[in-house]
Amino acid sequence: MKHKLQMMKMRWLSAAVMLTLYTSSSWAFSIDDVAKQAQSLAGKGYEAPKSNLPSVFRDMKYADYQQIQFNHDKAYWNNLKTPFKLEFYHQGMYFDTPVKINEVTATAVKRIKYSPDYFTFGDVQHDKDTVKDLGFAGFKVLYPINSKDKNDEIVSMLGASYFRVIGAGQVYGLSARGLAIDTALPSGEEFPRFKEFWIERPKPTDKRLTIYALLDSPRATGAYKFVVMPGRDTVVDVQSKIYLRDKVGKLGVAPLTSMFLFGPNQPSPANNYRPELHDSNGLSIHAGNGEWIWRPLNNPKHLAVSSFSMENPQGFGLLQRGRDFSRFEDLDDRYDLRPSAWVTPKGEWGKGSVELVEIPTNDETNDNIVAYWTPDQLPEPGKEMNFKYTITFSRDEDKLHAPDNAWVQQTRRSTGDVKQSNLIRQPDGTIAFVVDFTGAEMKKLPEDTPVTAQTSIGDNGEIVESTVRYNPVTKGWRLVMRVKVKDAKKTTEMRAALVNADQTLSETWSYQLPANE
């Protein structure tokens, strides 16, 4: 009898162990769990989010919203040894709809509940009973990226499907988004939003954080997986499964949003001690055929859309080229420390276009630059689309380019002139562009290398002069191109690349001179 009891006990223990092993190995939250919800939503009518925000928060100004601060002592995971911490955004202003935030552990999913005790409200007068059941507007991720004993914010997810990410020594600048719909179309843009998040609790030794998100909008839903890998360059690995509810005019995949107010290619119309003011100064593209393209940004007087058609893009990004503080001179906003963002597709994305949208703006508070990939063909509503890519947030722009291919260091615009016999320069009605090219391999070339430029211009202009000379300061080459515009009320397209005989030395400088009206 005793032997039978021991055998039964051993069998029970064995079954318990097997059950534990089965449970721990088979249960795991994944993007497929989010995709099921996204696909289910796509088959139903869209339900607009409802705001539960009291008017004192909904109608507040930005200065008041800034007074609502998260209490750092109450950071989520503060009592765990994980290097990652979470803090949350309170609702206020146009952040007036709650998002659900969940924690994923090895065995369960747990809702992170809102509590006003997480926050200090400064001088904002409010009734505590009216806020006790509010939700969060978003969240931020903290990590000791600059110092082992200090947690710095590295990710912010707040508003629609926007998120911002930085690496070591960087400050927030441009944003990424989950999805863009009908950007710059006359019908108006649709802004999908992340309505729910699932964040995996990291282990003490983890150097990456996994975040899942459910996206929703009137005409699309989506499931997203973000793996954040902080470092000198912070890299975000993105996987998305997108479902259309209804047909869209244009789908923007891996969208980036930035700001360009003025720079040397388009100087400020008013006197300003800051020579440049922008989060990014150009769109870089690595096309499917291997060509590298650089499109300097503008702040046009009218909406401008540029489209670069290709098959299977190798990468694109909005970059901040030129890191010298003297280029910006802004002690408050430190544009010299703002990151570039580079999208690297995984797999073949097929035929489509990298599009750049430039929107007029009068000040730096408005994001007026958008770049994204838009596929030529979209599936019928309900069918799944898969996109995988990484976004690298970096201040090392030269590493975001092929080392054997020279890149544009800067583009400067000037009044075109001709040196007279008396050595005085006389304006001749042209516009001059001074374009400096540099690169690791280019610096190795002897200065007497016969570098020339291949240039072209659209129907609205004429190239009057094009010269290339060695630049001993940058150990690169400088292109000076004088152009005559036929109709100033129209845009003018220009292209240029440096060559040595039949060898291409540089990326293609592709510039659009905005209409001046």
From Swiss-Prot:
GO terms for molecular function: carbohydrate binding; catalytic activity. Pathway: Glycan metabolism; osmoregulated periplasmic glucan (OPG) biosynthesis. Residues 1-28 form the signal peptide. Gene3D superfamilies: 2.70.98.10, Immunoglobulins. SUPFAM superfamilies: E set domains, Galactose mutarotase-like. It is found in: Periplasm. It comes from the Bacteria. Keywords: Periplasm, Signal. One of its GO terms (biological process) is beta-glucan biosynthetic process. GO terms for cellular component: outer membrane-bounded periplasmic space. The keyword Acetylation does not apply. Its main location: periplasm. Belongs to the OpgD/OpgG family. Involved in the biosynthesis of osmoregulated periplasmic glucans (OPGs). This is Glucans biosynthesis protein G. It comes from Escherichia coli O1:K1 / APEC. The lineage of its organism: Bacteria, Pseudomonadati, Pseudomonadota, Gammaproteobacteria, Enterobacterales.
